[in-house]
């Protein structure tokens, strides 16, 4: 896969370049056969990289050769800042042009591609923030239902797990992300733990 003329964060600022993905990794641009070419004109590409401390999960980072191709493609004006925790990123559905996980496209032009929501069911349950204000229920069929401040069904939508990361597509039209770090779920400004089952 080749992203042509896409903006990335470089070591000395932003630049427009070509980015090649091969075997699940970001490769040197070079030349070679590409099964798919994506026009990146007007778009920006960022990487999802491990944070500097392991207990902080992942963050928005530079797209560089040799890293896993966990990539987000959005309009340039919507590019999240370097260093932003991944679980704080929110993108409008129509702005999310592509999301790649280990080089595999899982969202394209705002549409989720076929993948299992919760392959082993390990994260199913109600996750509650420290102030008991947010209750996020991850349902077995790949749906979530949030109660916020006692208001039931405040946000509802679909979710997909990818290792310790979770992708949300809200019914109201935006994507958000989260991450399981230890026994906690980080999402937006919330830190949640799974509620004990009765």
What is each stretch, according to the model?
Residues 94-99, 104-198:
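Lipid interaction determinants
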Residues 50-76:
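His/Asp/Glu-enriched, well-ordered alpha-helical/loop segment
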Residues 1-34, 43, 69-73, 78-85:
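N-terminal metal-binding scaffold of metallo-dependent hydrolase/deaminase domains
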Residues 17, 71-110:
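C-terminal cap of metal-dependent C-N hydrolases
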Residues 42, 66, 103:
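Conserved, mostly hydrophobic/aromatic
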């Amino acid at each position: 896969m080749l992203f042509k003329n896409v903006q990335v964060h470089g070591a000395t600022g932003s630049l427009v370049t070509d980015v090649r993905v091969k075997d699940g990794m970001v490769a040197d641009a070079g030349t070679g056969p590409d099964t798919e070419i994506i026009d990146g004109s007007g778009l920006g590409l960022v990487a999802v990289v491990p944070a500097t401390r392991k207990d902080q999960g992942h963050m928005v980072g530079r797209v560089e050769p040799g890293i896993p191709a966990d990539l987000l493609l959005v309009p340039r004006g919507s590019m999240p800042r370097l260093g932003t925790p991944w679980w704080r990123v929110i993108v409008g559905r129509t702005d999310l042009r592509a999301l790649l996980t280990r080089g595999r496209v899982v969202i394209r032009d705002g549409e989720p591609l076929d993948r299992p929501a919760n392959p082993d069911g390990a994260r199913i349950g109600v996750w509650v923030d420290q102030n008991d204000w947010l209750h996020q229920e991850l349902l077995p069929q790949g749906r979530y239902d949030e109660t916020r401040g006692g208001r039931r069904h405040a946000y509802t939508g679909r979710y997909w797990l990818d290792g310790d990361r979770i992708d949300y597509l809200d019914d109201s039209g935006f994507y958000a992300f989260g991450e399981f770090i230890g026994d906690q779920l980080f999402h937006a400004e919330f830190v949640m733990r799974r509620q004990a089952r009765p």
